[in-house]
Amino acid sequence: LKFNFFKEKTPPLIGVDISSTSIKMVELSDDGRGGYRLDGYSSAPLAKDAMTDGGVGDLEKVADAIRQAWKLLGSREKRVALALPASAVISKKVLMMAGLREEDMEAQVEAEANQYIPFSLDEVNIDFQVLGAAPNNPDEVEVLIAASRKEKIEDRVAAVEGAGLKVTVMDVENYATEAAYSLVSSQLPNAGREQTVLIVDIGASMMHINVLHDNKSVYTREQSFGGGQLTQEIQRRFGLSLEEAEIAKRKGGLPESYDNEVLQPFMQTLAMEVARALQFFTSSTQYNRIDHIVLGGGCAAIPTIDVVVQDRTQVHTIIANPFHSMAISTRLKQQQVATDAPALLIACGLAMRGIAA
């Protein structure tokens, strides 16, 4: 396995998003016109405690869920791209002299990494990418260094290999979200150029916040809030098991009181959390406004959630659908794809690594 946060393209592969509650997979291909085609996607639930604190808690349970998702996907492809949570990766931008040879740059990256990584370099994997010329000095380049502890990577790789698949790319979740956002930005005025966009990917227990200015990431943060709170409230209110509550949340069939007493208050809380994230960003950075909000994650499929968030924040809000202008396999239903799309941002961004579109 080449540890490559930044390697551009590889042969086709499946994007695999391992979250705290499920495994999500996306398979894309080249549409022959310089774009992407969605060939398939799948999702399989993870047993409780299979993942803990962003790491693999029970290898066998995670491998089982990966195997199940792969069978549902119905693909022959066994190569996959994985991502680490941003919390497991230390990233830093540094300046270096322009025109350095590859080996000199590698040596300097190691020296830089040594200063800010709190572990021995033997315990970490490091990768770097030259971002371009330094803003104020033509003789320097800006370099992004990413490092993660080997054990964090090895656990995920072992789970995938336990399911009979092969990891060829290791990425970072927020980089994968940014890649998928490049497909979503066409839904915004001027494709998001010269604007500040807040991407909120709402997981089961965490909100992942990524702010892009002029389509470049300027800020990332995690906030403790997620769709799991709605599931727990359904369990508590209607006396259901966790599994029953998850199914009811997605497929319906709950008493009439659900909408007014459970769902609407949850939507208001979610909108308040997004408003908090927005305030935190504008008060702690040089940017004093957000032009657009993009909602991703399972909660973004709740009907009218974009309207509720827009009302609360007074900022134009859309639901992330990275597949909206993609060719879609005939075996997939367009309407279902649109519903499922917001939860597939990371898996889609990872699958994009396999296609030179």
Stretches found by the model and what they are:
Residues 1-357:
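Hydrophobic/aromatic-enriched cytosolic interaction surfaces used to assemble or bind macromolecules
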